[in-house]
Design a protein with these regions (language model features):
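A beta-strand edge to alpha-helix "cap/lid" segment located at domain peripheries
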Residues: 2-10, 23, 28-29, 44-128
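Core segments of small alpha/beta cavity-forming domains
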Residues: 10-40
Length: 128
């Protein structure tokens, strides 16, 4: 798989899986492992509210929201990918809809490129 495809696959797979996670679809333990295996243990995130989140914090948060949003949809738009060497950069818009509430965020994500796949390394979100 080419580097650009690895980044897009990681991004789309995560968004599909987090939607399943929020809605409670699928077997929880298997889905949890599938989600966290896509991240570097050094992953860091800056949320739309400006909070810093580590991989540990993210992995501890996940079980608290399994099945909490049965109607949530997660949609990606405007995906652009750049890459060089061992890193990929994706910029995109993420739209989450739960019943009548919709949130949008502009995001930039850095991925570590391995032989097999791209791993989430750093994510910055901004509310739009």
């Amino acid at each position: 798989m080419k580097d650009k495809e690895k980044v897009i696959t990681a991004l789309v797979s995560f968004c599909n899986n987090i939607e399943k996670w929020f809605t409670g679809e699928g077997e929880q333990d298997m889905l949890y492992q599938e989600i966290v295996s896509g991240f570097s243990p050094d992953f860091k995130m800056i949320t739309g509210d400006g909070d810093a989140v580590s991989f540990y914090m993210f992995s501890e948060w996940l079980p608290t929201v399994y099945g909490k949003f049965p109607s949530r949809l997660v949609i990606l738009e405007d995906i652009e990918v750049q890459y060089s060497g061992k890193h990929g950069l994706a910029t995109y818009t993420e739209i989450q809809t739960t019943e009548e509430e919709t949130t949008c965020r502009a995001s930039s994500a850095i991925f570590l490129l391995t032989e097999e796949k791209a791993l989430w390394f750093h994510l910055i979100e901004s509310w739009i």
